[in-house]
Amino acid sequence: LRFDAKGRVWYSVAASNHIGVYDPRDGSHRWIRLPAPTWGQAFSSRALPFFLWLSRNFDLSGASGGEGVSAPVPYGVDVAPDGGIWFSQLNAHRIGRIDPETLEVEIVDTPFTAPRRLRFDGHGKLWIPGFSSGLLARFDPQTKKFETWEIPIEPRGSETPYALNVDRERDLVWICGTNSDTLLRFDPRTESFTVYPLPTRVTYTRELDFDREGRVWTSNSNMPAWQIEGQMPRVLRLDPHALPVPE
């Protein structure tokens, strides 16, 4: 969920390939159907109500799904400084912009796979985690150019960054080390990473936020929850100013 300057709430509807917008002033909802890269993905998104009805009314246990058709899966959403609404399509390997007034959609292919929960920094640049590509990307909406950095977790390419957030006051990018029980900080000025190991094993972090002191907050979100060490999910707070910087 992201709020724009008018107080409207923008959100992704992953299964049916929509971005939704809710205006609390009048209670109105609107849904923007996003383009799909293939005919099969477009059909599967539109036919979702039929598939759900089919699964509720017929016993499909034991049926083979074959190779199947992946859905585009709109995922991350954020509001740009100019008011534009940007989103990612996880399985379509692209990002896009929605004009908040005309609702016209512009699509941009990414040079990496599986863009997920993206965020803008204070300079109007869009930061994107490459979930299945193990990298961090920065996109300039003005030049339409991408820059990428490999996340320094061994073995290289094994990290699956689920989400990131930008501490705009300090101009730092924080990333969920979802596959390595870490949080990572990236400094765009030096193009360097700092890796902070978490105190619990088999964590799964899906979101980050900050408090006024610059401390980082996240939570464990395993499914099922008992997979985590100690079988008890936790809310975590990391204070980067109170810890020695890891070598």
Language model: regions and residue ranges:
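Conserved beta-strand positions in repeat-built beta-propeller and related beta-rich domains
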Residues: 9-15, 70, 85-91, 126-132, ...
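Beta-rich, blade/repeat-based domains predominating
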Residues: 1-6, 38-82, 111-123, 154-170, ...
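Beta-rich catalytic cores
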Residues: 15, 73, 91, 114, ...
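A short loop-to-beta-strand structural motif that recurs across blades of beta-propeller domains
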Residues: 18-21, 94-96, 135-138, 182-184, ...
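Beta-propeller fold detector
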Residues: 30-37, 41-44, 106-110, 147-152, ...
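Blade-level signature of beta-propeller repeat domains, shared across WD40, Kelch, NHL, RCC1
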Residues: 205-247
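Short loop/turn segments that connect beta-strands within beta-propeller blades
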Residues: 23-27, 99-103, 140-144, 187-191, ...
